[in-house]
Amino acid sequence: YNTGDVCVSLLKESGNTMIAHFIFKPNSRNFWHYHPDAEQTLLVLDGEGYYQEEGGEKRVIRKGDVIVTPPNVRHWNGATPGSSIVCMTVTEHAIENHAVQLRAVTDKEYDR
């Protein structure tokens, strides 16, 4: 459920916690998605990327940024055209399917 070159490593998935490490190469991003009844924390470890919640403006995120996405909020994130981004997510979830994938982020949405 990604567009472009994305490397995902699952670091922990036991109990109600999932920790994942992502490397998004330039121009890559995940799909619009949300986490049912679960908050997600995204930590930017390196590089530069984008983050957007449905109905909000796309914003630039950089190394050191921490983004907390409330439960059930549709969102996406990925790299900028000129930079990779490395990030880690921590999601506390109470159900098996921790993310509901919606649709690809269009080029028009990405380029806005």
Predicted regions and their residues:
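Short, conserved beta-strand element in jelly-roll/cupin
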Residues: I23-K25, Y34-Y51, V90-E92
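Short acidic-glycine-tyrosine-enriched beta hairpin
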Residues: G55-N72
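A short, N-terminal "cap"/entry segment at the start of jelly-roll beta-barrel domains
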Residues: Y1-M18, F31, H98-R112
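Asparagine-centered strand-capping/turn motif at beta-strand->loop junctions
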Residues: G78-T80
